[in-house]
């Protein structure tokens, strides 16, 4: 069984180099693919020097987004004979046992398309997995306050996520996951119409529709420092929110088949949330 990992770099050379150095001696990883997503800094000159028998560096001609960049790496890995491929944001950290635990799930279940472990932030808070939602529930999940109020309707019960070494879920956190060659070739991986945000839901939808299952491995975890390229390149909170809302609207139309009236309500909710984001941003700037 051969396994690779894709690291997507966009103006985040420091984190990318750190992660590469941590992973390069892991025997469980046959190959490391670093995709430079048309960085505008000095990444290219440094990354070119990493090319060797274990590391392949791919330079995208233009930045077409998070999904498109990772798909470049996936396609390279599977065309070169890999059976499974992880992706990892540059600002993540792993122990080698993490990869072994995740891969073990593919061997134990049938029709597994995607697996990930628990994600932890630097403060120990965990983000795990969540169900695919109807239009109404998806609307409720957009707002920070409604998400908290209706959390019992929007997320898996804690007991469910802790009952077994791995559990079937719909959506996995996107900062690191592992996809099988078969599932990628059948679904095409990420929807490249989405530049940034909503990728987790989209790939969850595509896999389920193709008959594949996603699992959360509950006995392993990785660290996500959340200091990556998105916050570096999009420093404005309002700017990030606008980009998120563009993807939310696209997801509602394309994958939830939202009608005209539903899209109207979505735009109203988004306008309120954007206003709250602007006020919060102004408060932080004082």
Briefly describe each language-model feature range.
Residues 21-30:
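Short, acidic, metal-binding catalytic loop of nucleotide-sugar glycosyltransferases
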Residues 13, 36-45, 62:
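A conserved acidic beta->alpha catalytic loop
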Residues 60-80:
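Glycine-rich, basic loop-to-helix element that forms the pyrophosphate-binding segment
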Residues 170-189, 193-221:
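A short, conserved alpha-helix in the catalytic core of glycosyltransferases
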């Amino acid at each position: 069984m051969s396994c690779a990992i894709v690291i997507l770099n966009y103006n985040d050379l420091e984190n990318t180099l750190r992660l590469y150095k941590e992973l390069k001696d892991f025997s469980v990883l046959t190959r490391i693919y670093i995709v430079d997503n048309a960085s505008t800094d000095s990444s290219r000159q440094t990354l070119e020097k990493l090319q060797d028998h274990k590391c392949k560096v791919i330079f995208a001609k233009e930045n077409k987004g998070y999904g498109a960049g990772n798909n470049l790496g996936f396609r390279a890995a599977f065309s070169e004979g890999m059976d499974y491929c992880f992706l990892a944001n540059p600002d993540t950290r792993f122990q080698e046992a993490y990869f072994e635990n995740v891969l073990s799930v593919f061997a134990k279940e049938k029709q597994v398309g995607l697996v990930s472990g628990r994600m932890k932030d630097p403060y120990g808070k965990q983000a795990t997995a969540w169900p695919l939602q109807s239009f109404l529930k998806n609307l409720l999940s957009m707002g920070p306050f409604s998400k908290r109020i209706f959390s019992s309707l929007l997320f898996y019960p804690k007991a469910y996520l802790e009952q077994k070494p791995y559990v079937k879920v719909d959506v996995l956190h996107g900062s690191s996951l592992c996809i099988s060659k078969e599932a990628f070739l059948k679904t095409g991986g990420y929807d490249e119409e989405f530049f940034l945000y909503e990728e987790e839901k989209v790939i969850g939808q595509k896999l389920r529709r193709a008959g594949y299952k996603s699992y959360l491995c509950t006995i392993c975890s990785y660290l996500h420092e959340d200091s990556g390229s998105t916050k570096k390149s999009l420093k404005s909170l309002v700017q990030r929110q606008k980009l998120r809302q563009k993807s939310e609207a696209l997801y509602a139309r394309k994958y939830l088949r939202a009608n005209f009236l539903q899209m109207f309500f979505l735009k109203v909710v988004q306008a309120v949330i954007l206003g709250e984001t602007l006020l919060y941003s102004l408060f932080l700037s004082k």
